[in-house]
């Protein structure tokens, strides 16, 4: 019935085309030369009211109703006209029938379903909005025992699931068999949503159904739904120890599938950790492998230790070939430790830990070696630059980059407004299904941090945080201060070798031999300072050029071809106002009243008018003309 009912909507036209394709290019050319003819208006006069409703012939529908047809009269299968209008998303006809007194919750068809059930099954958000505005009850069950939210979850109609919950439907509403929308989505839908959306809106992953005693995770495992399993285990921390009526737990079910390619590596790590017995947990090796806090501290300590041991190798008075052999052994040891103890998440901490270790040994080297070789003024300048570096680093590391944090009420308001606009704002370019927020212009969802950030620049592993609206200026300060600190280390190290070892730097090879014979530790630290200085120079130049000259972020520069407001400008930033004004806007400070920053609330700036350079909308939702968002995850620099 559903397939036949939707035939009119899927064909695209109620009158099939009668023209035949030309047999050769000459016929095509002759046809192309004919003047265009006006489209022929389809003749609906022979349609009965059911067919007219299915095909959207509202004029014919009005004619038949005005002639006395009862809009609540069902057909032989107890299906009403409102059912046919709903399943074909004929919104004008739905409005007309409701005005004429159609029963909004009429039950009919093989499944004893309401028009709202029919519209939901086909994913017609517009029809659902109209029916619920007229008082349709989404909690009514059909013959299969399912309410509308269960049907929407089964067919992956994420926008409908969100709309039902925003309108007050309990996300944990159970059908006749005790199945929740989360269970149905985990069982039926292999995509990320609506499982993620349901969890974000408060669905309980611990609920069990009446028939089997399964949780949503049980159902996901039975369906081999790797996406749902990963989302439930890693995002919602669903329990692996809940037994169903057969005594099976998600842990035992996953253990029986060990080695299966459809189970993600992170999920299997979680399974192995949960499978440890209490005796295994007490062993030192097990603690090292499975104690996350201990592994985290081991990860942090490794760069500190490796830096020190490598420096000691350079200071050993032996042949260089032996030194290189020792360095190779040192690398093998730490590489083996890393593979055994560190997972992908912990490896993301490596750049931050390397930075902290390098800076810590900078301080030790300056105080123990360089301080006596330089002036008091040089030490003070080094410490001042270091203090400023710490301020900028902490603001970049622990500061809020501009995270968009909606409340539950704001999320519901966003969903309802988007839905009642016709659902035109649910596109990934304008709506984040992970955070359930409308995306302000220049914002982006960072998959590393799993959050939307206003005026997103990039995710920086060297500070372990996103760089966005509220910490971008501190990040720029971090780069400049780090550059200055590295320069001071090179200056101090050269002074140390000149004063303590009489090294002459006009002869490079001779200077390197003298450094190795005198004190290789300071040379090792100088080499690290030079290495860090090289990439910091490149990054600082790139960031400064983008901010001042281009007036765009790293994300915008890499993905400008995906944004409509950049396409309209031929790839140039529509936000640039010239180098001086760009700098003033970025720093948000005035220069003795000569120039004033243009203060824009990027947390709530949603659209850009390329003609007037003004915001045309500052409501909490995106319009259909919003810029395209990027589909990638994040950028590392």
UniProtKB/Swiss-Prot annotation:
Molecular-function GO terms, alphabetical: protein-cysteine S-palmitoyltransferase activity
SMART domains: ANK
Enzyme class per UniProt: transferase
Reactions mediated catalytically: L-cysteinyl-[protein] + hexadecanoyl-CoA = S-hexadecanoyl-L-cysteinyl-[protein] + CoA
Entry annotated with the keyword Acyltransferase: yes
UniProt-annotated catalytic positions: 460
Compartment annotation: Golgi apparatus membrane; Presynaptic cell membrane
EC number: 2.3.1.225
Domain DHHC: 430-480
Keyword tags: Acyltransferase, ANK repeat, Cell membrane, Cell projection, Golgi apparatus, Lipoprotein, Membrane, Palmitate, Repeat, Synapse, Transferase, Transmembrane, Transmembrane helix
Tissue distribution of the protein: In stage 13-15 embryos, expressed in the central nervous system. At the third instar larval stage, expressed in the ventral nerve cord and is enriched in the neuropil.
Highest taxon above the source species: Eukaryota
Disulfide bond listed as a keyword: no
Topology term for the membrane: Multi-pass membrane protein
GO cellular component terms listed in the entry, alphabetical order: cell projection; Golgi apparatus; Golgi membrane; presynaptic membrane; synapse; synaptic vesicle
Gene inactivation effect: RNAi-mediated knockdown causes reduced basal secretion of Sog.
GO biological process: chemical synaptic transmission; positive regulation of protein secretion; spermatogenesis; synaptic vesicle exocytosis
Parts of the chain that traverse the membrane: 296-315, 319-341, 346-366, 374-394, 473-493, 521-541
ANK repeat start-end pairs: 77-106, 111-140, 144-173, 177-207, 212-242
Cytoplasmic compartment residues: 1-295, 342-345, 395-472, 542-637
PROSITE patterns the record matches: ANK_REP_REGION (PS50297), ANK_REPEAT (PS50088), DHHC (PS50216)
SUPFAM superfamilies found in the cross-reference section: Ankyrin repeat
Purpose: Probable palmitoyltransferase which is required for photoreceptor synaptic transmission and for the correct expression and localization of palmitoylated protein Csp and synaptosomal-associated protein Snap25. Probably palmitoylates Csp. Probably also palmitoylates the dorsal-ventral patterning protein Sog and promotes its secretion and activity and the stabilization of the membrane-bound form. Required for synaptic vesicle exocytosis.
Subunit structure: Interacts with dorsal-ventral patterning protein Sog.
Similarity comment: family membership: Belongs to the DHHC palmitoyltransferase family. AKR/ZDHHC17 subfamily.
Protein name as it appears in the record: Palmitoyltransferase Hip14
